[in-house]
Amino acid sequence: MNKIDSKLGRAALFSFLKEKSPLGPLKILANHIGYFFQIPMPMFKPYVVFGAQANKKVLVTERDKVLWRNTDPVTDLLGQGVLIVDGDEHDHYRKLMEPSLHASRLPEYTASMISQTDRVSSQWRDGEIVDMLVESRKIALLIIMDTLFSKDVWDDLDKIWKPVLKSIQYISPGAWILWRKIPRFGFRKPLKELDDYLFGIIEERRKKKDWKVESGKSDLLQHLIDAGLSDKVIRDQMLTMLIAGHDTSTALLAWTFALLGQHPEIHQQVVNEIDKTNDLERVPLLDNVIKESLRLYPPIHIGNRRIAQEMDFDGNKIPKDERLFYSIYLTHRDENVWENAQSFCPERFSSGKKPAGLSYVPFGGGPRVCIGATFGQVEARVVLSYLLKKFMFEFTNHKIHPHMGATLEPRPGVMMKVKRRKLSVNSNQYKEIK
């Protein structure tokens, strides 16, 4: 394994200062060292791998050699959430949750996605500059609470907004990576407030013994209750879906708006495509834009694993108990795989072209591929098509940089001027997604 000398270290530091993100140093190290390197930080020296071959080892062929992680803020917050448990426990929770996120359920979710999007966008004044990072978060939060838990949180947004953001901040990378026991102030109260809110939803549903009959439907919350899970385990799954689900959708929507704003010609092409149809199954350019947004700025940009058994990456060995990061961000920008890898080129996904192997993994891969992958992509298609049909978006040309939080999001936000289009739009115009 090549060492990081002082010259390369200075280049990495300069890149960090220039890009205001650790992604800069990662790109520098990857370009000079290759697909495997170790970052020599104080008290923390994680190994980093990327590329299709490494992804195959970590996600498929040798996945039993890696475990999720030791105790940290993520495990503290999410408890036994499906995202972070291993083995049979993971498989059990996943099996319980998959029916509510299956593609067959998406048609009934479409109406909710549109109505929640309309709710938020109806608050915009014509010609107003809005932050599409914030607005996307509102939309995604409303959608996930309504579709998976049948909970309308519109009137509670002010109540849960800060607790949700503090929860995301709590699990975002920070000094705790270097020093696990570092004091962290200002989290206890908002995290408890969010817990109380979720436990309240569970309690309310348990009291409604005939909810399925009266509502004529079922949802994820009901599946978990019917499975006999404790309130604590149900809370863990709810919080996992709430935080991981809505935060990834927020990042995807915000980055897509940013990219369209930075590429007005493609923006107009997408608008023209959407104007020609009410069928959300027939928007190939929009689908390619979403895929390219996921390639350039994957919401979950890095996977964090702990080595349970020594692993070998092309002769480079990682001992047991070491920390391994597999970088989705670097994989998606590999110049050996992607032509014009740093550029926004939606056409690269045209004509049904599929990236080779595991060189494209915005939702992970293998048996633990993101349980909400299809839901998230359909949600993006519905929200974007509805808003682009209803509004013109003008980017304000401010500088944006990727921020490595719980997800990879555009900072300081995506400021866009919104103007209502004369084209009439309502939810009944859309055909259901099949």
Model regions and ranges:
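Cytochrome P450 proximal C-terminal region
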Residues: A30, T117, V134, I160-S167, ...
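Cytochrome P450 heme-thiolate "Cys pocket" and heme-binding signature region
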Residues: K95, A244, I302, N316, ...
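Conserved cytochrome P450 K-helix E-x-x-R motif and the immediately C-terminal K′/meander segment
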Residues: L13-G34, D196, N278-D314, E335
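Conserved cytochrome P450 K-helix/beta-meander segment immediately N-terminal to the heme-binding cysteine loop
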Residues: Y326-K353
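Cytochrome P450 catalytic-domain helical core, especially the substrate-recognition surface
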Residues: N2-K27, N31, F37, M43-K45, ...
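Cytochrome P450 fold signature focused on the C-terminal beta-domain
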Residues: K209-K217, V271-P284, L296-N316, T331, ...
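Cytochrome P450 catalytic-core helices
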Residues: T248-H267, V271-E273, T374-K389
